[in-house]
Amino acid sequence: MTEVQQTEKVTPRLKTKYREEIRGALQEQFQYGNVMQVPGLVKVVVNMGVGEAAKDSKIIDGAVTDLTAITGQKPMITKARKSIAQFKLREGMPIGTHATLRGDRMWEFLDRLVTLALPRIRDFRGLSDRQFDGNGNYTFGLSEQTVFHEIDQDKIDRVRGMDITVVTTAKNDDEGRALLKALGFPFKTDQ
């Protein structure tokens, strides 16, 4: 008889840390009566704008390949909603890609981002803590995709930046900042 091998589902390291340590600490810090009031993560959106794709549609393929390697899932191609003559842009032309990460993929991506990718940025002094949107969500940009280990530096066709948005259930920026700081986001200290 053939044996069906049961593979154990491994919980991401950062998710375990959040459940066991961070959630309790935040509940004490903000004096919540209910554990469900503690801010958590909803999703992470990684967006790569590729404006040059309007002139050459092959450029978008490189961005899709890079984003697939970084996030571990196939990204959506963003198309232009309106035609803009000054940019030589027609409605429906591909102008970027984005991937929305939820669940375990989100936790794994954030773990890799905080522990491996951000420390590889040259002259990195920390993330600005002024980029919250007022509702506890945080957006920041990376100027090149080579900070991720998944990208082979010899095989990149061009340097592409990306925007990363971390959506949380926090009610305000202070809660969001406390959550991300506890998760290991390196914010600038001297302001």
Curated annotation (Swiss-Prot):
Gene3D superfamilies referenced in this protein's UniProt entry, alphabetically: 3.30.1440.10
Keyword Ribonucleoprotein: yes
UniProt GO MF annotations: rRNA binding; structural constituent of ribosome; tRNA binding
Cellular compartments per GO CC: ribonucleoprotein complex; ribosome
Disulfide bond sites: none
Origin superkingdom: Bacteria
Any one GO biological process: translation
Keywords noted in UniProt: Ribonucleoprotein, Ribosomal protein, RNA-binding, rRNA-binding, tRNA-binding
Protein family: Belongs to the universal ribosomal protein uL5 family.
Self-association and partners: Part of the 50S ribosomal subunit; part of the 5S rRNA/L5/L18/L25 subcomplex. Contacts the 5S rRNA and the P site tRNA. Forms a bridge to the 30S subunit in the 70S ribosome.
Known role: This is one of the proteins that bind and probably mediate the attachment of the 5S RNA into the large ribosomal subunit, where it forms part of the central protuberance. In the 70S ribosome it contacts protein S13 of the 30S subunit (bridge B1b), connecting the 2 subunits; this bridge is implicated in subunit movement. Contacts the P site tRNA; the 5S rRNA and some of its associated proteins might help stabilize positioning of ribosome-bound tRNAs.
Record-given protein name: Large ribosomal subunit protein uL5
Protein species of origin: Micrococcus luteus (strain ATCC 4698 / DSM 20030 / JCM 1464 / CCM 169 / CCUG 5858 / IAM 1056 / NBRC 3333 / NCIMB 9278 / NCTC 2665 / VKM Ac-2230) (Micrococcus lysodeikticus)
Classification of source organism: Bacteria, Bacillati, Actinomycetota, Actinomycetes, Micrococcales
Name of encoding gene: rplE
